[in-house]
């Protein structure tokens, strides 16, 4: 029998962490965080990392396992999450995956394809073009040959933009087509997957409130502390939404009010991309939240019974 795993997904600020905590308490579970930022030590406020009190209440896995300068990929997440799930099940607890990084969830639950088209010389050429011409230029170029992939990517996803162009230019096949045709391996888990669905105005208000709370909690000071500790400004985690705008503000590119406006705007755009991603996941069940949270509790209890 495959291990059973409960998945709570959704856009940023939708309430995933709070719901996962409630479910873990009710189901005697432990939480595995599927988030590309909370894996990094020192990135606490801007990543909305579970608080120390929440971590004392329920064990949370895959938090603070990398330095900001250390790489962490979807493949790394898959390995770490598999080990965490095995350990949780061995203790007789219920594993609950919670997070908004769709690629991590897909890597664990459906697998990752190794696309063809490896060309280090072309990749370096594309990297130099990106530095000179900007990510938006290469993303627009990708949209002409692989619109499905381009719609899922943000200009910050530099490596993935380069990789998608590399695949197309070496094979003539869009990365999205390759993934669709080759499919994914059978999942090693029996999963029950929910995506939290909020009315867009409510979600955007939650985002605005969260950004205000992060700034009040000391997000700017957190970034200053990371820089003072020797974390380079161009390291990957500091290019994430929230951190990169604070960096630009500290470097004098714009004032505090503009920084706040951009963080809120960019986070809203990010949430829309997350929703688009989760809509492509065939096993994901969409649940109106928070009004139907009882439905999730009931289904999860039955699932683990």
UniProtKB/Swiss-Prot annotation:
Q: Where are the transmembrane segments?
A: none
Q: Which SUPFAM superfamilies match?
A: P-loop containing nucleoside triphosphate hydrolases
Annotated ATP binding lies at 10-17
Q: Which residues form the signal peptide?
A: none
Reactions mediated catalytically:
adenosine(37) in tRNA + dimethylallyl diphosphate = N(6)-dimethylallyladenosine(37) in tRNA + diphosphate
Cofactor(s) named in the record: Mg(2+)
Q: Where is this site: Interaction with substrate tRNA?
A: 101, 123
Q: Quote the record's binding site residues for substrate.
A: 12-17
Q: Can you tell which superkingdom this protein's organism belongs to?
A: Bacteria
E.C. number: 2.5.1.75
- The segment annotated Interaction with substrate tRNA runs over 35-38
Q: Which terms in the Gene Ontology molecular function aspect does this entry carry? A: ATP binding; tRNA dimethylallyltransferase activity
GO-annotated biological processes: tRNA modification
Please provide the record's keywords in A-Z order: ATP-binding, Magnesium, Nucleotide-binding, Transferase, tRNA processing
Name the job this protein performs. Answer: Catalyzes the transfer of a dimethylallyl group onto the adenine at position 37 in tRNAs that read codons beginning with uridine, leading to the formation of N6-(dimethylallyl)adenosine (i(6)A).
The UniProt entry, under HAMAP family, shows: IPP_trans
User: What is the name attached to this protein's record?
Assistant: tRNA dimethylallyltransferase 1
Task: Give the originating organism.
Answer: Trichlorobacter lovleyi (strain ATCC BAA-1151 / DSM 17278 / SZ) (Geobacter lovleyi)
Q: Which gene encodes it?
A: miaA1
